[in-house]
Amino acid sequence: MLTDSLFSYATTRHAARSPVPHSTEIAPPESPPRPGHVPPRPERRAWVVLVMIVVFMMISYADKAVLGLAAVPLMEELGIGKSTYGLISSSFYLLFSLSGLVVGFFSARISSRVLLLAMAALWAVAQLPVLLVAAVPSLIAGRVLLGMAEGPAASMSMHALYKWFPTGRRGLPSALQIGGAALGTAVSAPLLTWLIVDHGWRSAFVALTLVSAAWCLVWPFVGQDGPFGEERKPVRGASRPPRAAGPPLRALLTNGTVTGGILSAFGSHWALALSSAWLPVYLQTQMDMTATGASSVVSGVSVVSLALLLSVPAYVDRLKRRGVSSRRADGIPQGLAVLVAGGALALLPFAAGGPVQLLLIAVAFGCHAVALPLHYVTTATVVPDGRRGAVFGVVAASGTLPGLFVPYLTGRLVDGAATETAGYTAAFVLSAGVMAVCGLLAIATIHPERDARRLNPAGASVPAPRQAGVSKPVAQ
């Protein structure tokens, strides 16, 4: 999903928070930048907040990764099979989507600063049950609580981040926020594996508890809501400016751009759920790697994701500032990333030779990450600021649904097959098919400029990009 804020933003006061309007009158979405228009540069404070949010996401994904890294010794100590382990892993997502949805609808009433602090505090508490009693029920209880607390993390931290960065400057910050996930896995995998191998798997859970608590101590001093996308209190005696009539929430959620973004996120999170729960186990049991070797591969995959997250969205921002449409810059790449990752995953079970397998693993579990920041960017293009938190909550809740069943389904397929190898083959081919369908549908349905004009015909105009040497807007 590097984060927080020590900034001295001299000219910006703390933005007033307002509840979701009871009427249908809401501020229109921010228009995509006009060709040749350069959005205002974010103030220095925004970058401090960004750093804290990246760290927030690093901790979040380390919490997710620790169970997979500890899976082999944990299954051996507790004497559980792969189906039971898959159930424990899936339990993380039992309340994950629901909590993301609920918190999203309250995000306009509660400061992002408070929401993020509450989440991180619960992360620390959620690691305690397994430390007190190492058993399947305590593992499930801790993972359910952790999933509930982490469900809103990506969408709400992105919502908080967008309060600091204007339209046209959000691609790189979005990528860094999501990059915190890849960076968290890349950094935490070798460190947590070292703790697991040398000090037992419980030590990794203790370390994550302490890190979450430390973040909670720093955030209240530096966390703050930003100036963009929040309603300001009018000056006393001044008339409130007219506001555009906004579309109903149902129309926002069912337009092609938001639906396509959900599909690309669904395919990406399918791969993410599969890799978080099963990639370390697959590397150790099917490719005969040590725990340390497996953690190195997991870190390498995260580095691939991070490199793409840092390069692709930044390039996308530059394209849009040059007049390239959001569909071409944001929409097609996110669907294509999921499609390519699915293709690599389909080939993985049939590849011969370690280097080829490692390359396919890097593509299958690394490339899909590009879809995660870009689907938020395309969604924000068509959604009014006053409803962005709620829509982000729905998008996150829908897109992350694979985590609820993919780990358990994979465990059942592996346990139920004639051999473990056959089980993994079935799981990977099935996953590849789902990812391919999601990627293709995302490419076909995401049209940000078109949908923004349809949803806000009376609002601010959404200019179409112009091709070089052409004076007329290009039809979307």
Task: Identify what each model region corresponds to.
Residues 65, 93-101, 151, 185-186, ...:
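Residue-level signature of mid-helix packing/kink "hotspots" within the transmembrane helices
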Residues 98-134:
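Conserved MFS/SLC helix-loop-helix module at the cytosolic interface between two early adjacent transmembrane helices
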Residues 67-68, 256-312, 372, 376, ...:
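Extracytoplasmic gate region of multi-pass secondary transporters
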